Amino acid sequence: MSKPFKLNSAFKPSGDQPEAIRRLEEGLEDGLAHQTLLGVTGSGKTFTIANVIADLQRPTMVLAPNKTLAAQLYGEMKEFFPDNAVEYFVSYYDYYQPEAYVPSSDTFIEKDASVNEHIEQMRLSATKALLERRDVVVVASVSAIYGLGDPDLYLKMMLHLTVGMIIDQRAILRRLAELQYTRNDQAFQRGTFRVRGEVIDIFPAESDDIALRVELFDEEVERLSLFDPLTGQVESTIQRYTIYPKTHYVTPRERIVQAMEEIKDELVDRRRIMQENNKLLEEQRLTQRTQFDLEMMNELGYCSGIENYSRYLSGRGPGEPPPTLFDYLPADGLLVVDESHVTIPQIGGMFRGDRARKETLVEYGFRLPSALDNRPLKFEEFEALAPQTIYVSATPGNYELEKSGGEVVDQVVRPTGLLDPIIEVRPVATQVDDLLSEIRLRAAINERVLVTTLTKRMAEDLTEYLEEHGERVRYLHSDIDTVERMEIIRDLRLGEFDVLVGINLLREGLDMPEVSLVAILDADKEGFLRSERSLIQTIGRAARNVNGKAILYGDKITPSMAKAIGETERRREKQQLYNEEHGIVPQGLNKKVVDILALGQNIAKTKAKGKGKSRAAAKSGVVEMDMTPKALQQKIHELEGQMMQHAQNLEFEEAAEIRDQLHQLRELFIAAS
């Protein structure tokens, strides 16, 4: 199943990349646990990491600070490794309200969640790839430090089928039910199976477009074949197949029975303590809720909120870390922490917020104390589990620098020859009028401007002022969700407007080559929005344009400003020197607007062609590229309905055509899901 990593790129490493690749590989081979890659905006950090992965041939997990950047990295890695397993592992909740209790108003909030099925399938595909092969790159968000099913139990539950094996039909159906597959002879979809005589069709939970047909003769498996679940066309016959559980949380029956006894013992102890403390209402509430859960587990093998009993189900002791995605990563795996100055503090903060909420639930009798062990990893547990790690950032934090022993791999020179922006400091008194004249200069030559302010009020007032003076301006603030944010960035790049105003504005990761000016108002107000790292990240947004410039408005130069200006000038000098020595003329980036959202777009087309079904990809490609993420979501629902209708009418050609369109649309939508 595994293949060697094969890097697919028209470019060879250039600029600082060859040296960075060499130093990182040497460090990994010498056994260094921590290394830091300081790569400026637009220097090709992802390409450098892809080269390291391809050269060392090691399974890799890439941690990103949010879904948007994870989606962008997933798209890039898919293009670099089209023949290998590039997987995507982020939270599968479109909406999630954890259960909580507010003592002051005596309000209990039930858990409420909406699961994105496509992302759930991709998570299952990610763990399957890690268990089966070595040529795997998993792009994950901080979701990777949250509890997942125990890999040992997960492996125990798998159903192995081989041609010629002796097994009766009822045994297969019983095993499928234990894996939480449901029988559905009408609507054949992911995580279901259907039975027709001695033929069992199974739609694997981790698969998007292929199903398994098991043909029995008496009690022997006569034939195994993979087929298209939509058209019924057989793709290939195989000798063996492994069916993985429908969720990561399946548990063998004997483990559930054992866990139930342990839960009963804990309930007895907890009831005694509550009665001694005269907490009779809480004791009655806890007894009722726990006994209901136990009855559900006894009858069905699971219950709502079963994750709260995960300590017993995975056989852990009190306080032990939960199994996570890190337990699925091989021992010689590699961890890459992207935008580490943001991701590392995030990992540290997850445990404390979760703990505070659960302690209230335990205290007031909604949960047993063992529910506290259903939690994300503590930071020290993450450190203990993490394999050899490369931290990637334009502005590494103190933690990464300390762990790397101050040794930083510099990647300052860009392959395109682009220089860091010129920085000017101008007085605050005339900042708004000065900014207006600068905006007009940029708008006249079809370039864009980013403006960052300190407060929401100032951002609103500035937007209003610029609009009154005839400028095309939009305002980005924290109330805007991911989908709208992507739309605004897209519209800025397309030239629907010229100026984007924000507060903690668009720092990490997103590429906007059209932006030639970044204006930072009140740059001399020392604080987290005007720290050295914040300033360098914000200035870096203009580093993808040949005419890149940053204007810092301030009446004095603060220590943070001095450091940010000093670091930017150091980089600019190094870049200029390299360009002069090698005769390089800086070139602007012509990055297509769709690239922000187009995840593995070309891969989806290639995959479709490989199956002889590319006819729809070409037809639909043009339409979808101009659609907003909101429209994409509506289009997906609409097309799914059409596809099922065609399949019911036995119009398989049309159904397959729509299915190929859906492949592309879903890839595009991941960024906004």
Curated annotation (Swiss-Prot):
It comes from the Bacteria. Residues 633-668 form the UVR domain. Residues 26-183 form the Helicase ATP-binding domain. ATP binds at residues 39-46. Transmembrane segments: none annotated. Residues 431-597 form the Helicase C-terminal domain. GO terms for cellular component: cytoplasm; excinuclease repair complex. SMART domains: DEXDc, HELICc. The keyword Repeat does not apply. It is found in: Cytoplasm. The keyword ATP-binding applies. Coiled coil: none annotated. Keywords: ATP-binding, Cytoplasm, DNA damage, DNA excision, DNA repair, Excision nuclease, Helicase, Hydrolase, Nucleotide-binding, SOS response. GO terms for molecular function: ATP binding; ATP hydrolysis activity; DNA binding; excinuclease ABC activity; helicase activity. A motif (Beta-hairpin) lies at residues 92-115. GO terms for biological process: nucleotide-excision repair; SOS response. Belongs to the UvrB family. The beta-hairpin motif is involved in DNA binding. NCBIfam families: PRK05298.1, uvrb. Forms a heterotetramer with UvrA during the search for lesions. Interacts with UvrC in an incision complex. The UvrABC repair system catalyzes the recognition and processing of DNA lesions. A damage recognition complex composed of 2 UvrA and 2 UvrB subunits scans DNA for abnormalities. Upon binding of the UvrA(2)B(2) complex to a putative damaged site, the DNA wraps around one UvrB monomer. DNA wrap is dependent on ATP binding by UvrB and probably causes local melting of the DNA helix, facilitating insertion of UvrB beta-hairpin between the DNA strands. Then UvrB probes one DNA strand for the presence of a lesion. This is UvrABC system protein B. It comes from Citrobacter koseri (strain ATCC BAA-895 / CDC 4225-83 / SGSC4696).
